[in-house]
């Protein structure tokens, strides 16, 4: 059983939980329903979505929010990639991999990826293939300036939120029903989000950049 969480940032800079869903290893058919639920509750448009690697989720985003840009979480990608790497190689491997996603431009990142492939490709083919196959979503953040990159680069907001939820689920390992689990999770969510009164870091400059890239989709009412 898994708990799926969606967190958004309003144009006012305030974070908000958009929804939580309890399920198992969901198929690709599950995600359009989740996204349509979010849309029906009032989220009319999404500029950029930061995701991990759920099967079929990117396609579902394209169907429900066709204008949304998708950024695959770099932290999740690094974790997945290093699964295949021997311990003795890991430090050097991670250093070389970091040069890819810390490049200032996509062009330079692709050069670093080619170097990475040349050095490690024969030994860790699956790791390199993961970068190649997912590059379209891994490289989205290169389009934007630093202010926007810091927000979409990873799903850290959700990771931190989930860390708070785990304290609840670990303290009580067995729940009699899904409803009992959901109620406990909901109460934990309310406790966590009480601390979300402030705006995202450096939001004024971030909003300024968002207006440059997405201004035609933002109305004055959206900023209130």
Regions of interest found by a model, annotated:
Residues 23-27, 49, 70-73, 85-89, ...:
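A generic short alpha-helical patch detector that favors 3-5-residue windows
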Residues 7, 20, 41, 46, ...:
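Flexible, active-site-adjacent loop/turn segments at secondary-structure boundaries
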Residues 48-55, 60-96:
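Conserved beta-strand -> loop -> alpha-helix junction used to position metal-binding or nucleic-acid-contacting
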Residues 1-51, 55, 64-67, 134, ...:
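RNase H-like nuclease fold core
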Residues 66, 99-224:
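Acidic/histidine-rich catalytic cores and adjacent linkers
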Residues 16-20, 43-45, 78, 94-97, ...:
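Short acidic, glycine/Ser/Thr-rich loop/turn "cap" segments at secondary-structure junctions
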